[in-house]
């Protein structure tokens, strides 16, 4: 395995974008999109806590259904946790908006939210942000880095990584981004 330059856009066929939708923050990006040009297998490791945020419940449903994923929409600033049925409904609204903007199935849209717990998502800002993200997405390394920055809350730096490995005699690139509260 060898580390290569980039993050979520390092692998062929993956695009990303970021935007400042005004979810919570002013004058900084707070939404990111990761998009796969083709539907792909999705897997997840989820909390075992009885309290789960709406996006966790949504993503568990998507993964359990066996649907192929094609997009991940993430917002920072409001976690959409402890928001009840309304918060889960906003996940459906988010998936529907992404499906329409990207011309894909809503069943293949994963959602991530990070930030303040117990506050409802401003869904109008979120769906408007999705339209912007869809228009800005591309496969540049810069867009991947900007997406990693957009999901930060109290993080001190964006976290992204890409590696190349040999599988069956072919080189495969895997890219990703992550966030963590107060990460050093």
Located regions from the model:
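Alpha/propeptide regions of enzymes that mature by internal proteolysis
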Residues: 1-184
């Amino acid at each position: 395995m060898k580390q290569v330059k980039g993050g979520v856009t390092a692998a062929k066929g993956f695009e990303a974008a970021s935007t400042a939708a005004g979810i919570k923050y002013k004058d900084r990006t707070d939404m990111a999109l990761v998009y796969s040009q083709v539907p792909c297998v999705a897997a997840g490791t989820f909390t075992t806590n009885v309290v789960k945020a709406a996006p966790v419940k949504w993503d568990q449903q998507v993964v359990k259904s066996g649907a192929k994923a094609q997009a991940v929409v993430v917002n920072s600033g409001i976690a959409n946790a402890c928001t009840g049925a309304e918060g889960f409904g906003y996940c459906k609204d988010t998936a529907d908006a992404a499906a329409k903007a990207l011309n894909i199935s809503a069943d293949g849209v994963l959602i991530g939210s990070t930030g303040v717990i117990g506050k409802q998502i401003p869904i109008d800002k979120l769906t408007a942000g999705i339209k912007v993200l869809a228009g800005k997405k591309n496969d540049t390394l810069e867009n991947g880095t900007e997406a990693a920055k957009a999901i930060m809350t109290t993080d001190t730096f964006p976290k992204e990584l890409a590696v190349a490995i040999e599988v069956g005699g072919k080189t495969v690139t895997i890219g990703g981004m992550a966030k963590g509260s107060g990460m050093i």
